[in-house]
Amino acid sequence: MSEVIEKAKKAKVAKEELVHQPTERKNEALSFIAEAIRFKQDEILAENEKDIVRGKEKGFSPALLDRLALTPERLNDIADAVMLLTKLEDPVGETLETIRKDNGLFIENVRVPLGVVGMIYEARPNVTVDAATLCLKTGNAVILRGSSSAINSNKALVRVIREALERSALPEDAVQLIEDTSKETAKQLFTLNDGLDVLIPRGGKNLIDMVVRESTVPVLETGAGNCHIFIDESAQPDMAEQVVINAKTQRPSVCNAIETVLIHKGWAEEHTKALLQKLEEAGVEIRGDEAVCTMLPSAVPARETDWGTEFLAPVVSIKTVAGIDEAIRHIRQYGTRHSEAILTENQENARYFLTSVDAAAVYHNASTRFTDGFEFGYGAEIGISTQKLHARGPMGLKALTSSKYIIKGNGQIRI
């Protein structure tokens, strides 16, 4: 029996036990997990260092190494996020709708767990904890399949989580890690219809596209983040500089960082040069159109492929546009429906942009870096969905539930 099949069977048994666990027991288990992450910090960091060393030997980019790295601060943040989940309302059992029929039937639509959730993801060990704890809070079992680049970190984290579950009333088999990171195990997950209720990919465009293309299991798609900021003609210069610098440089390797800035030509004439200099001082490589390269000779001429690239690095493409309609057309052509922003003092233009742009999150005068489960008050997130069915945007607890109808009667029959 393959590792995938064996662990899927265990997860399936565990999910049947989880549906009977009250919120108090789930929260207790989460508290044990947060405590264990803090207590076993040195052990986790030692295993993470093995992944970092191997990544450097393989020539991983600084952006990839940043996503892979755990630090004491990041582990504390992860533990804090787990504890936050204990304070959030449990969506399972929530009544969505009630109907009382004339014949006496009482119909209730309630939230229920999805069942067994499969997670396939890349070099992000924090996803291991996010996925496991979100699933546990919502009564789901989870099968985790990370990448080979983070295998030591993932094994350490899952070991800590399962040890914490041993102390709790929850089954430790509710959290499974596929340790074989070969392509074969990924393909097995894609077609595990009798073992998985849903599969969630979290990573780069190539991974997500492959899962969507090849999976026969229902997929909750988390999209790549080729995010834009459009600086309208009336944008305040100081605010525009502050928001653009934050959205690009605070953490360039994440999906809600911007990759392209579109600048209204009326704003560009007076203010763009100062913005370009600020970006360059912040260590950002600028790839610009002809107007941008004229203002900043050190800028690299942008190629067509740059407009559609999610750099996940301190690199930004910048283009001047004639107005808001050209900016929206550009976003429609190259955007990934993740997060898009307009900076403007013109309320009509803001309304037009927010209505016209098709994305999971659209912003007016704010950084795209806020598209995040924690920032939205969801605690940790399972991913950011760019699709429209079931869930869209940061997926917190409610996104990991479905619903069912409970009908109560006293002998009614249909005539």
Swiss-Prot record:
- What Enzyme Commission number(s) does the record list for this chain? 1.2.1.41
Biological process terms in GO annotation: L-proline biosynthetic process
Q: What class of enzyme is it?
A: oxidoreductase
Q: In which pathway does it act?
A: Amino-acid biosynthesis; L-proline biosynthesis; L-glutamate 5-semialdehyde from L-glutamate: step 2/2
Main location per UniProt? cytoplasm
Q: Which InterPro entries does this one have?
A: Ald_DH/histidinol_DH (IPR016161), Ald_DH_C (IPR016163), Ald_DH_N (IPR016162), Aldehyde_DH_dom (IPR015590), G-glutamylP_reductase_CS (IPR020593), Glu-5-SA_DH (IPR012134), GPR_dom (IPR000965)
Show the catalytic activity: L-glutamate 5-semialdehyde + phosphate + NADP(+) = L-glutamyl 5-phosphate + NADPH + H(+)
Q: Which UniProt keywords apply?
A: Amino-acid biosynthesis, Cytoplasm, NADP, Oxidoreductase, Proline biosynthesis
Entry's Gene Ontology cellular component terms:
cytoplasm
One Pfam family this sequence matches: Aldedh
> What Gene Ontology molecular function terms does this protein carry?
glutamate-5-semialdehyde dehydrogenase activity; NADP binding
Q: Where in the cell is it found?
A: Cytoplasm
Q: What does this protein do?
A: Catalyzes the NADPH-dependent reduction of L-glutamate 5-phosphate into L-glutamate 5-semialdehyde and phosphate. The product spontaneously undergoes cyclization to form 1-pyrroline-5-carboxylate.
- Could you tell me which NCBIfam families the record lists for this protein? PRK00197.1, proA
**Family from the record:** Belongs to the gamma-glutamyl phosphate reductase family.
Q: Can you say what this protein is called?
A: Gamma-glutamyl phosphate reductase 1
